[in-house]
A protein has these predicted regions:
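A glycine-rich dinucleotide-binding beta-alpha-beta segment and adjacent secondary-structure elements
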Residues: 159-167, 186, 366-373
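N-terminal Rossmann-like FAD-binding beta1-loop-alpha1 element of flavoenzymes
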Residues: 6-33
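Mid-domain catalytic core of redox enzymes
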Residues: 225-336, 343-347
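Helical element adjacent to the flavin cofactor pocket in flavoenzyme catalytic cores
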Residues: 183-246
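Glycine-rich FAD pyrophosphate-binding loop
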Residues: 25-50
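A conserved beta-strand/loop capping segment in the N-terminal third of enzymes
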Residues: 45-54, 64-120
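Rossmann-like flavin
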Residues: 88-181
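Conserved flavin/dinucleotide-binding core of flavoenzymes
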Residues: 323, 329-373
Length: 373
C-alpha cells in the first residue's frame, strides 16, 4: 500500500477545512486536504439550478458581516471577497405581520411595552452581571425560565428560539447559556450577518484556488476510512479513492478533522458514519445541528431588506433570507431568491418539508401561491 508523508492532513474541504489548510500553508507546512465529494465547499458552496444559486448548507451569509472574525480571517489570508452588510438588525414575523427593526431597540414594536421591559431586564442580566460558574453550562431555556415567566412572554421566548434555530440549527434546550450570551455579545459588537457577493460558492472557490496555488495536495473524491493513532497521538489516515477503489496511507503528525465530532470519533475506531445514522440517532452529549432549507424563486420581492426575517409564529421555519436584495446575480433576471431555514425535529423529512411549505403559505398567503416556485 502506497504511503505519502505530510506535515498536516485536513479531513473535509468545506469552509472550515479550507481555512485551516490556508493557515497551515501560510506557515510553510506540507498539507494534504481530503474530500469525499468531487468538489470543495461542503456546506458552504452552491449549485446552479434553473439559473439560481442553490446553497448546499449556508444561506449565502457570513456571520457578523464584514466586521466579524471570519471576515477578518479572510482579509488576513488575502482571500478576495466582498460582503454586503445587513441594513437592519432584522425583521420579525409575529401575529401575521412582518415588523422591521433597524436596530436592537426596534424590537419594541415586536414585543410591546411589557415584554420589552423583560427584554431589557434580560439584557441587563446577560451583559452587565457576571454569569455564575454553575449557570454557564445550563441549557438556555432553563436559564430563561428562571428569569422570566415564559408562559406570559411567548414572543420573547420565540425571539430567542428563532435566532438559535436559524444561527445554530439547535433548540434552546440544546444550547448552553454562556454560548448564547457570547453569541449575542458578538452580534451587538460586530453586527448582523452579511451576504457574500457571488454567494457562498464564490468564496470557497477563491479559497480553493488559494490553497492550490500555495501547494496544497488536494484529493477530491477521496474517502477517509480510518484515522491512525498511537498512544493518543494521531499518525495519519487510511484513505480510498472512490473512483478506482485503491487504498493508500497518508502519514502526518497533525490530523485536523472538519467533518463533525460523531464522524471523527467513528474514524478513530475504524468505521464510518452514514447520513442515515445522523438523521435517526440522537446523541444527548453531542447535539448535532440538523437543518432543512427551502429555496424559492419569486416574481416579487417578499422581504424588503438585506437581513434576516425571523419567524416567531410558525411551526417550523425559523427565518428567511432574500439574498438577491444584495446580489441579484444569485437568481435569474427579474427573479428574487428566498431561502428559509428550520431545525429538523423528526426523522420524517417529507413531513418536515410539508410543514415548511405550510409555514410559507401562512407567512406570504396569496403571494406565495401566485408568485413563488
Amino acid at each position: 500500500m502506497q504511503t505519502q508523508h505530510f506535515d498536516a492532513i485536513v479531513i473535509g474541504a468545506g469552509l472550515g477545512g479550507l481555512l485551516c489548510a490556508a493557515h497551515l500553508l501560510e506557515r510553510n507546512k506540507r498539507v494534504a486536504i481530503l474530500e469525499r465529494l468531487p468538489h470543495c465547499g461542503g456546506r458552504f458552496t452552491a449549485k446552479t439550478f434553473q439559473g439560481a444559486q442553490i446553497s448546499t448548507g449556508a444561506v449565502h451569509m457570513l456571520p457578523f458581516g464584514s466586521s466579524g472574525v471570519l471576515a477578518h480571517t479572510l482579509r488576513r489570508l488575502h482571500i478576495p471577497h466582498r460582503i454586503c452588510d445587513a441594513d437592519v438588525f432584522g425583521s420579525f414575523h409575529v401575529h401575521g405581520t412582518q415588523v422591521r427593526a433597524r436596530g436592537l431597540l426596534g424590537v419594541y414594536n415586536v414585543f410591546g411595552p411589557r415584554q420589552f421591559f423583560w427584554f431589557l431586564r434580560l439584557g441587563y442580566q446577560m451583559f452587565f452581571r457576571r454569569l455564575p460558574a454553575a449557570q454557564r453550562a445550563l441549557p438556555f431555556d432553563t436559564w430563561l425560565a428562571r428569569h422570566i415567566d415564559t408562559a406570559r412572554n411567548a414572543e420573547l421566548v420565540a425571539f430567542f428560539a428563532s435566532i438559535a434555530r436559524f444561527a445554530l440549527s439547535l433548540e434552546l434546550h440544546q444550547v448552553r447559556t454562556d454560548e448564547v450570551i457570547r453569541t449575542t455579545r458578538h452580534m451587538l459588537r460586530f453586527g448582523a450577518p452579511g451576504i457574500v457577493q457571488g454567494g457562498c460558492g464564490a468564496l470557497t472557490g477563491q479559497l480553493e484556488q488559494q490553497v492550490r496555488q500555495r501547494g496544497a495536495h488536494l484529493l477530491l473524491h477521496t474517502e477517509v476510512l480510518q484515522i491512525l493513532h498511537n498512544a493518543g497521538q494521531a499518525t495519519g489516515v487510511r484513505v480510498r479513492n472512490k473512483a478506482s477503489g485503491e487504498q493508500s496511507m497518508l502519514d502526518a503528525p497533525l490530523v485536523v478533522s472538519d467533518i463533525g465530532p460523531r464522524a471523527t470519533g467513528a474514524l478513530l475506531h475504524n468505521r464510518q458514519v452514514t447520513q442515515a445514522e445522523v438523521l435517526t440517532q440522537h446523541c444527548a452529549q453531542l447535539p448535532e445541528a440538523l437543518g432543512l432549507k427551502v429555496h424559492l424563486l419569486s416574481d416579487i420581492s417578499l422581504i424588503p431588506h438585506k437581513g434576516i426575517m425571523y419567524c416567531l409564529d410558525t411551526r417550523r421555519i425559523a427565518g428567511i433570507v432574500q439574498p438577491t436584495n444584495a446580489d441579484p446575480r444569485l437568481a435569474p433576471a427579474s427573479k428574487h431568491l428566498l431561502i428559509s431555514h428550520q431545525v429538523i425535529q423528526s426523522t420524517d423529512l417529507a413531513e418536515e418539508r410539508a410543514l415548511a411549505l405550510a409555514d410559507l403559505h401562512t407567512l406570504f398567503g396569496e403571494s406565495f401561491t401566485r408568485h413563488c416556485r
